[in-house]
Structures are given as structure tokens and as C-alpha cells.
């Protein structure tokens, strides 16, 4: 069975942009987002580089209690989804 998919809105939380506009601008500039790992001590690890998402504040997208209960990857998903809903101009109350 084939289904058609329609993209109505976009959202992004990435190492090179915390929204679609910044992400796209940085792609055009050739920014890669890779740098030294800062989230934990890498002394005992061979890997020293990563593409970390920096400057993300979950409280901009959800209440502090919800943010505390979620892993960071889930916070990213919620934030990107909210941006996509706004971009699509969807009225979620309907």
C-alpha cells in the first residue's frame, strides 16, 4: 500500500541550529557543529569530539517539571515538534 505524505511544517534542534532558520543558515555557511565533548569528562574515552547541541533551554518549550522528567532527546523532540506545529500554522485546539 502506498501512502502520500505532506510536510506542512518543519522544526529542528541540532548542533548547528536550535531552529530551522539557524540550522539552514549554518548549513549554507558550511558549519559542521563538531567540537570537543563538553557534557562529560572524556579522559577515559578514546572519542574526544562530538556534535553536541549547545544553548538549548528546555524551559522555553515546556514547564520545568516536564523538562525534569524527560531525557534530553525527548526535550529536543518536543521542541522541534512545537516549532513544526507553529511553522505549519496548525490550530491544535480543533
PLM features: what roles do these ranges have?
Residues 1-94:
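Conserved "HGTGT" condensation-loop signature of ketosynthase/thiolase-family condensing enzymes
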Amino acid at each position: 500500500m502506498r501512502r502520500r505524505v505532506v510536510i506542512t511544517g518543519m522544526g529542528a534542534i541540532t548542533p548547528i541550529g536550535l531552529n530551522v532558520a539557524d540550522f539552514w543558515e549554518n548549513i549554507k555557511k558550511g558549519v559542521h557543529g563538531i567540537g570537543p565533548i563538553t557534557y562529560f569528562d572524556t579522559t577515559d574515552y578514546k572519542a574526544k569530539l562530538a556534535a553536541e547541541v549547545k544553548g538549548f533551554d528546555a524551559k522555553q518549550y515546556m514547564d520545568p517539571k516536564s523538562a525534569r522528567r524527560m531525557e534530553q532527546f525527548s526535550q529536543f523532540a518536543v521542541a522541534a515538534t512545537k516549532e513544526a506545529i507553529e511553522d505549519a500554522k496548525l490550530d491544535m485546539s480543533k
